[in-house]
């Protein structure tokens, strides 16, 4: 793929992330207007950088032909909530929506990863309308509490620093922190 082809390929994903951020923030706004506790604290989103996509394709043996189906997190959104109960609340709100279809759910809160990582992941099908017609893409929505996010961020940084080979003491501390 040339850079211009990549840009063209990523356009619908960029559009989807923009639209989904507005829609998810809209949910928060509606709760606040009614003076109710919003399960959504804040929303971030990104499109995976081209280099990261290429790297993951090599690591997983994914071809360009199957890229759209096999790489489910090219478009990624993160929904932060205050409390663990809010996670399920957000999941049920998203299940009721007509403008997206949840095709996969991974509950790393109930079933935390060995590392202690906790988060709720949804893979959705989402359709964007472009001047060339409509295009359905896959996007990943991660829902987690602020504490889980803080933990995941630290774990990610440590992984980077120690190349995944943590000193035992840090590993123990991380596991204790993950339980909070």
Model-flagged regions — what are they?
Residues 68, 81-180:
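Long beta-strand-rich cores associated with HINT superfamily self-processing modules
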Residues 73-77:
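Short amphipathic alpha-helical segments
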Residues 3-6, 10, 79, 164-167:
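Short, structured coil/loop segments at alpha-helix boundaries
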Residues 1-72:
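Charge-rich, low-complexity segments
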């Amino acid at each position: 793929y040339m850079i211009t082809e990549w840009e063209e390929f990523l356009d619908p994903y960029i559009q989807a992330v923009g639209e989904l951020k507005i829609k998810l923030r809209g949910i928060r706004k509606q709760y606040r207007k009614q003076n109710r506790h919003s399960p959504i604290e804040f929303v971030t989103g990104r499109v995976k950088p081209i280099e990261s996509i290429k790297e993951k394709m090599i690591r997983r043996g994914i071809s360009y032909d199957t890229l759209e189906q096999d790489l489910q997190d090219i478009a990624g959104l993160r929904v932060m909530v205050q409390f663990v109960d809010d996670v399920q609340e957000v999941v049920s709100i998203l299940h009721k929506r007509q403008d997206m279809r949840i095709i996969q759910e991974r509950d790393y809160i109930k079933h935390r990863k060995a590392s202690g990582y906790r988060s709720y992941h949804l893979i959705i099908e989402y359709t964007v309308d472009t001047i060339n017609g409509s295009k359905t893409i896959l996007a990943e929505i991660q829902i987690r509490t602020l504490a889980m996010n803080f933990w995941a961020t630290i774990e990610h940084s440590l992984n980077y620093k120690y190349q995944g080979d943590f000193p035992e003491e840090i590993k123990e501390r991380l596991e204790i922190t993950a339980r909070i």
